[in-house]
């Protein structure tokens, strides 16, 4: 790839977490029966007038502020004209010449440092409905529940140079949306989705190459794979002396290929013009001040603070601050007396494993920050071993029990009395004379075997440090 430079820009659509749609009072609840959250406005009936959802405007502005955009006090809604069965108006209400937010940036973590990605604009628009194709009765249906749901489109500058950078940008953007509480970030349900514009140009050339737009990328993994596949496809074309066609391509995850969908539209193809049913949107300075004050501590600042305040590594801080609820949980556990690094290790290991296996969020977990802090303390004080922590964690996670009471009730308090442990050590050595001889002959890896045997005799309750000391002493 030394001969060519990759150029990537992303268009991200984020569905705003308002209770009602952008221009009417219909619910935005996901999963309702088809065509139940629909009225005359969002179904495009003639003679009705849209009214802007103030909360959606607030959310869009907060996102703009979070990425250091210029917020335009006056912006204009425009009609984006195209035909599709799930678009009841025959056009989409969007913004074109004067968007709500523009000229921002986002710093993303790259190779232990940061890289600044420019953000061209953030504008508001209403979502389309959903086409449902049924093979059983050879028919297509339209569900308008999603039609009119408020979206923001976040358009980046073409500043990314690899698929890895594109994924890092998306993850950082999603974290900000989650911290603000304005989008649930669910890529599978389509509430956070992106189109990737990919092109190649000869290394050192300033002029951009012909770009393609990639669609149907509904996970971070698929974003990376789709971009990598498209880069390879374009490189093969250029090396064979062929031209890249400007088009929209669909990513097929099963086959790991991109396929042509249609020619890539330009702005003039949509015949944008100001929507005559909506007056220009004017924002009072007082509103902007109020919304700026409501901004939380954002992921980048919190990441830096976690490293400075708690002594965490870059990787640990990145993982723990990826979602606001996870970072809040961690800090609550530390406030309850948990050693910061030990709490981090437990949360990134056992805690995250349970969340992922059960596919639940932090807020849905029965386990509390107090319980995590108490479990860390018990291990630090030698009351329980790391093995016992591993063995009981799933029960604690699902039951919400406090660790100290649980351990005592189950008789799992760690044995640290050297006399009791010495008895078990002597029995193990007496039962395994061949292994003892082999160890003394140089096969020191057998230490783990002896450790396992002693732990089995004590049902995992022996203090590992005491066991190691006694074995080392007796094996010479």
Curated annotation (Swiss-Prot):
Record field: catalytic activity: L-glutamyl-tRNA(Gln) + L-glutamine + ATP + H2O = L-glutaminyl-tRNA(Gln) + L-glutamate + ADP + phosphate + H(+); L-aspartyl-tRNA(Asn) + L-glutamine + ATP + H2O = L-asparaginyl-tRNA(Asn) + L-glutamate + ADP + phosphate + 2 H(+)
GO molecular function terms attached to this record: asparaginyl-tRNA synthase (glutamine-hydrolyzing) activity; ATP binding; glutaminyl-tRNA synthase (glutamine-hydrolyzing) activity
The keyword ATP-binding is annotated on this UniProt entry: yes
Keyword Protein transport assigned: no
Disulfide bonds: none
Annotated SMART domains: GatB_Yqey
Domain of life of the native organism: Bacteria
EC number(s) stated in the UniProt entry for this protein: 6.3.5.-
GO biological process annotation, one example: translation
Record-linked InterPro entries: Asn/Gln-tRNA_amidoTrfase_suB/E, Asn/Gln-tRNA_Trfase_suB/E_cat, Asn/Gln_amidotransferase, Asn/Gln_tRNA_amidoTrase-B-like, GatB, GatB_C_1, GatB_Yqey_C_2, Gln-tRNA_amidoTrfase_suB_CS
Record keywords: ATP-binding, Ligase, Nucleotide-binding, Protein biosynthesis
Family of the protein in this entry: Belongs to the GatB/GatE family. GatB subfamily.
Task of the protein: Allows the formation of correctly charged Asn-tRNA(Asn) or Gln-tRNA(Gln) through the transamidation of misacylated Asp-tRNA(Asn) or Glu-tRNA(Gln) in organisms which lack either or both of asparaginyl-tRNA or glutaminyl-tRNA synthetases. The reaction takes place in the presence of glutamine and ATP through an activated phospho-Asp-tRNA(Asn) or phospho-Glu-tRNA(Gln).
Assembly description: Heterotrimer of A, B and C subunits.
Protein known as: Aspartyl/glutamyl-tRNA(Asn/Gln) amidotransferase subunit B
The species this protein was found in: Oleidesulfovibrio alaskensis (strain ATCC BAA-1058 / DSM 17464 / G20) (Desulfovibrio alaskensis)
């Amino acid at each position: 790839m030394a001969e060519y430079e990759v150029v990537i820009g992303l268009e991200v659509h984020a569905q705003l977490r308002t209770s009602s749609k952008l221009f009417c009072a219909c619910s935005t609840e996901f999963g309702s029966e088809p065509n139940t959250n629909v009225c005359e406005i969002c179904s495009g009936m003639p003679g009705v007038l849209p009214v802007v959802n103030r909360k959606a405007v607030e959310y869009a502005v907060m996102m703009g502020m979070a990425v250091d955009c210029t917020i335009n006090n006056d912006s204009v809604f425009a009609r984006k004209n195209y035909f599709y069965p799930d678009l009841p108006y025959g056009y989409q209400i969007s913004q074109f010449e004067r968007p709500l937010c523009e000229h921002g940036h986002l710093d993303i973590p790259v190779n232990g440092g940061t890289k600044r990605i420019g953000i061209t604009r953030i504008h508001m628009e209403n979502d389309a409905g959903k086409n449902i194709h049924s093979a059983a009765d050879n028919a297509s249906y339209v569900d308008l529940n999603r039609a009119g749901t408020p979206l923001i489109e976040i358009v980046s500058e073409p500043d990314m140079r690899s698929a890895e950078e594109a994924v890092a940008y998306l993850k950082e953007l999603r974290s900000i949306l989650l911290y603000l509480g304005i989008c649930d970030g669910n890529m599978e349900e389509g509430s956070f989705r992106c189109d990737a514009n990919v092109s190649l140009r000869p290394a050192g050339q300033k002029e951009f190459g012909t770009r393609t737009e990639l669609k149907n990328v509904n996970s971070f993994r698929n974003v990376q794979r789709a971009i990598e596949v498209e880069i390879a496809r374009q490189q093969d074309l250029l090396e064979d002396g062929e031209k890249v066609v400007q088009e929209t391509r669909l990513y097929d995850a099963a086959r790991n290929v991109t396929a042509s969908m249609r020619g890539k539209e330009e702005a003039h193809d949509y015949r944008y013009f100001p929507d005559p049913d909506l007056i220009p949107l004017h924002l009072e300075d007082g509103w902007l001040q109020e919304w700026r004050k409501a901004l939380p501590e954002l992921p980048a600042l919190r990441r830096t603070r976690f490293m400075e305040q708690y002594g965490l590594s870059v990787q640990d801080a990145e993982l723990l601050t990826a979602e606001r609820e996870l970072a809040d949980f961690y800090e609550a556990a530390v406030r309850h007396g948990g050693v910061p690094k030990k709490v981090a290790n437990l949360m990134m290991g056992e805690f995250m494993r349970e969340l992922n296996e059960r596919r639940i969020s932090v807020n849905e977990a029965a386990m509390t920050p107090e319980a995590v802090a108490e479990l860390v303390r018990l291990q630090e004080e030698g009351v329980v071993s790391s093995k016992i922590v591993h063995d009981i964690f799933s029960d604690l996670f699902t039951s919400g029990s406090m660790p100290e009471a649980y351990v005592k009730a189950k008789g799992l308090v760690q044995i640290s009395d050297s006399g009791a442990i010495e008895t078990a050590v002597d029995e193990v050595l007496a039962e395994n004379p061949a292994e003892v001889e082999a160890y003394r002959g140089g096969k020191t890896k057998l230490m783990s075997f002896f450790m396992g045997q002693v732990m089995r005799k004590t049902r995992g309750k022996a203090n590992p440090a005491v066991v190691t000391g006694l074995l080392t002493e007796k094996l010479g």
